[in-house]
């Protein structure tokens, strides 16, 4: 016979008793997601993150999140020409309860892209890599379709391969010039207005008439080194926070945003 107390009986309860239910949302905080000042809608939504606990800092889990928003929502416009464009914004910094985002790419909705592909016409696509003035390396995808002549009785409107090569070369030249001659803010404004695609369509009319010319997708391949002052300048008001000057021990002036928290040191 075993000598000792039976812990299960001494507690007077059943093994595996009722556990206290903890609401997981009680450990989370809401943050406002802010778009750059090139868009009319500055607050595009809210996002959740676990509250800061010890070494686990909430802002570290917010940085790098990507938000996909329709251009119609960003510009407060119900124009159908804007609704099928999706802009991707990436969280780069956190100021107080504001998540400051920057441009991370653009794409067309799947239904719009598939509705353009039809029979009896030639699809022409160009893929261009170019760098902006401020150091962003972008890959731009352009798409266009040959248009039928209204006076022609033919069912088809196929272009010759020599014409396709000329149109693709013209697309490449225009996109390269537009991207390399502008900074990121100016380029985003051009993408929102679709001015690059309109220039391509107008320039290629002499080679072969085109229709449904769009910048189909934009990818950000490489970014310059992160600078918080440039991000605050891109947001105008800096997400509601001002920048204050801090004097270091050497006497140099350092610009730090209000509410700046120094990183946690692993060792002293």
Curated annotation (Swiss-Prot):
List the Gene Ontology MF annotations in alphabetical order. Answer: structural constituent of ribosome
User: InterPro entries, alphabetically?
Assistant: Ribosomal_eS1, Ribosomal_eS1_CS, Ribosomal_eS1_euk
Region (Disordered), start-end ranges: 1-21
Q: Which UniProt keywords apply?
A: Cytoplasm, Developmental protein, Differentiation, Oogenesis, Ribonucleoprotein, Ribosomal protein
Coiled-coil regions, chain positions = none
Give the CC-aspect GO terms: cytosolic small ribosomal subunit
Which GO biological process categories is it annotated with?
A: oogenesis; translation
Q: Name one Pfam family in it.
A: Ribosomal_S3Ae
Protein location: Cytoplasm
**The protein's assembly and partners:** Component of the small ribosomal subunit. Mature ribosomes consist of a small (40S) and a large (60S) subunit. The 40S subunit contains about 33 different proteins and 1 molecule of RNA (18S). The 60S subunit contains about 49 different proteins and 3 molecules of RNA (28S, 5.8S and 5S).
Q: What does this protein do?
A: Essential for oogenesis; required for late follicle cell development.
Which protein family is it in? Answer: Belongs to the eukaryotic ribosomal protein eS1 family.
| HAMAP family, per database record | Ribosomal_eS1_euk
What is the name of the protein in this document?
Small ribosomal subunit protein eS1
Q: Which organism is it from?
A: Drosophila sechellia
Ranked from the top, the taxonomy reads: Eukaryota, Metazoa, Ecdysozoa, Arthropoda, Hexapoda
Q: Gene of origin?
A: RpS3A
